[in-house]
């Protein structure tokens, strides 16, 4: 049985991809078979943090050049990875049929992973929402900035009203302290609960860190380059809580027939 977890955000620049990559690697290092799908279509860059340059991507699959299993790359840490590619015009303008083809194709994988982490494009674009609704669990990354609050709220509102999603995990990124992060979550939850009947689960925070910035510059993930650091421990702690997020029952097609 595969648990699919979408990592998303209301706006870009909040560290969503960094979190998705490090959580996927954290699970892999715990000996959990994990697949990372970069579904930030046309703007895919998770491979940069992994320090790899995949030969193939979803673009090859969509064009009919390769089967999905042929575009899966295995990293040196044994993480399975599917690149979203950088053919912006092709990937940003996918039809509903093409998006559904991508989703249903994952069921053809012979050896199903225990977890699939999906790096979703920021915001409430159609392609992002389709992949979100097809995941079992959704995690929203936000920061303490007012614009991040507004955009995250808008994303959750759209997910709830248009796609019947009502369960969301929340990660506060770029925080100055655990206390400040929790206060930011409490404030966001209070605002959200005034208008939407949704469940928000606080999973933890990732601190503002020069080490994380350096790891991005050096094309590496801090979970592997600084495995004993407080930052790596923060990712490990969050990865241990992923299953605490309730599953959404959207009625949408799913990546795997569990």
Residue ranges, per PLM feature:
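Walker A/P-loop phosphate-binding motif and the immediately C-terminal alpha-helix
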Residues: 3-40
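G-domain G4 guanine-recognition motif of GTPases
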Residues: 10, 143, 168-182, 205-212
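Gly/Ala-rich phosphate-binding loop of Rossmann-like dinucleotide-binding domains
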Residues: 28, 132, 160
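P-loop/Walker-type NTP enzyme "switch/lid" segment
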Residues: 37-111, 216-218
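Inter-motif core of Ras-like GTPase G domains
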Residues: 108-111, 125-146
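Anionic-ligand binding region
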Residues: 146-168, 178, 183-184, 188-191
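Beta-strand-loop-alpha "switch" segments that mediate conformational coupling across diverse proteins
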Residues: 195-223, 235
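NTP-binding/hydrolysis catalytic cores, primarily Walker-type P-loop NTPases
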Residues: 217-258
